């Protein structure tokens, strides 16, 4: 850190050395974790693709399968699941699915150390990608799973019951199975 600051100061005193100082900053600065840029780019792409599968893909597909009077209901269910499951994933789902459980055999859920993403920072990495990206990538699958189930009960379930079922599904079924 001090070496980088020294290089920056010296290069700024040289007349017209703005570009070399920027190059020096780019060369000597490094992230605190070893990130694989190709892997990170692919994870970003895959995250966007899975999110687009849910909204608008799955919601419009289900809207085409129901009667005209229920199109808005199915669209709203898919959009509400996306928002609610995302929030639930950040609050507790990620911690249940990917929290560390030490060496205790037989633990079916992770510890609660990552509630509200408490121990997830910009500097943390998981498998060569930033952990924040890993959280988002896994969240898209936590979102699309209950959205796929909507097709089974389209036109037959109340909105509030659908949200309660989706929350229970994510916390009691999806997240523990991810942890195994």
Regions found by a protein language model. Give the residues of each.
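Hydrophobic alpha-helical transmembrane bundles of multi-pass membrane proteins
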Residues: 11-180
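N-terminal secretory signal peptides that target proteins for export/translocation
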Residues: 1-14
